[in-house]
């Protein structure tokens, strides 16, 4: 019979040790034995709480931006998948919360940003929340590292080449390789995007498709035949001082 005092002591020791390890080390630790796996599998444990509180900006934890990710571990994961301050237009900066980009009011420029982590395998979903005016063009979707992040004029930059795929929320058009691929979603009088709505982007690297959801309603497959390349969450914007947030959710739930 296991001594409950000894078990509690062991738990507390592991908690302290794991709190001081780097996240990559925690991933390795979870593969050591079943006991450690179950310990770290608790996504609201004090270990994940400690890492979350020490790595995430306090501003993001106090807001409702992360309301779709309920555990400390998923909040932490979302932070490491957020917009990259090193992979965006020079006219864009990432706000202190770590999840929201701000486009500076630069005339005759279209500006884009990519997420920190791209995907080549598996199924992934993330939320995009446009928190400022859309302007004449506002596009959400995906791109490879080769896609441009800035250009002259007010254009649909995301979807303007063969390295990016986007949905223009202003006109409800799908864009790729500089061409309009059709209307989306395929509904009569499809409602336009309202500022503040959460759109879920669903990338399936196994079926090579990109889809979207709005208000928990699946809008259908937008793009098929995506290439076997690493693809990154991306948006492009034209309106000065507009802001766009992105929260990675993980594997999409079916049904």
Curated annotation (Swiss-Prot):
Gene3D superfamilies: 1.20.1280.50, 2.60.120.920
Name of the protein in question: F-box/SPRY domain-containing protein 1
GO cellular component terms attached to this protein's record: cell cortex; neuromuscular junction; nucleus; pole plasm; SCF ubiquitin ligase complex
Family statement: Belongs to the FBXO45/Fsn family.
Keywords: Neurogenesis, Synapse, Ubl conjugation pathway
SMART domains to which the protein is assigned, alphabetical: SPRY
Annotated localization: Synapse
Species this chain originates from: Drosophila simulans
Reported function: Required in the presynaptic motoneuron to down-regulate the levels of wnd and restrain synaptic terminal growth at the neuromuscular junction (NMJ).
SUPFAM superfamilies per record: Concanavalin A-like lectins/glucanases, F-box domain
Annotated GO biological process: negative regulation of gene expression; negative regulation of synaptic assembly at neuromuscular junction; neuromuscular synaptic transmission; positive regulation of protein catabolic process; proteasome-mediated ubiquitin-dependent protein catabolic process; protein ubiquitination; synapse assembly involved in innervation
CDD domains associated with the record: F-box_FBXO45, SPRY_Fbox
Major subcellular site: other
């Amino acid at each position: 019979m296991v001594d409950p005092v000894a078990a509690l002591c062991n738990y507390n020791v592991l908690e302290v040790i794991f709190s001081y390890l780097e996240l990559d080390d925690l991933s390795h630790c979870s593969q050591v034995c079943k006991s450690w796996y179950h310990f770290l599998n608790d996504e609201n444990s004090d270990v994940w709480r400690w890492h979350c509180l020490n790595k995430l900006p306090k501003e993001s934890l106090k807001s409702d931006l992360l309301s779709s990710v309920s555990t400390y571990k998923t909040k932490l994961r979302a932070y490491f998948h957020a917009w990259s301050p090193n992979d965006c237009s020079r006219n864009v900066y990432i706000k202190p919360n770590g999840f929201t980009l701000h486009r500076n009011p630069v005339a005759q420029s279209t500006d884009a940003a990519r997420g920190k982590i791209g995907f080549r395998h598996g199924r992934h979903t993330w939320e995009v929340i446009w928190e400022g005016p859309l302007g004449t063009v506002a596009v959400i979707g995906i791109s490879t590292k080769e896609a441009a992040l800035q250009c002259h004029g007010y254009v649909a930059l995301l979807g303007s080449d063969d390295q990016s795929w986007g949905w223009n929320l202003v006109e409800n058009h799908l864009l790729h390789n500089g061409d309009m691929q059709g209307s989306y979603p395929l509904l009569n009088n499809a409602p336009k995007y309202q500022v503040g709505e959460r759109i879920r982007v669903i990338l399936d690297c196994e079926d090579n498709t990109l889809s979207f959801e709005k208000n928990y309603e699946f809008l259908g497959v937008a793009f098929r035949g995506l290439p076997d390349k690493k693809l990154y969450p991306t948006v492009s914007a034209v309106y000065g001082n507009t802001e766009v947030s992105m929260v990675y959710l993980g594997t999409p739930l079916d049904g």
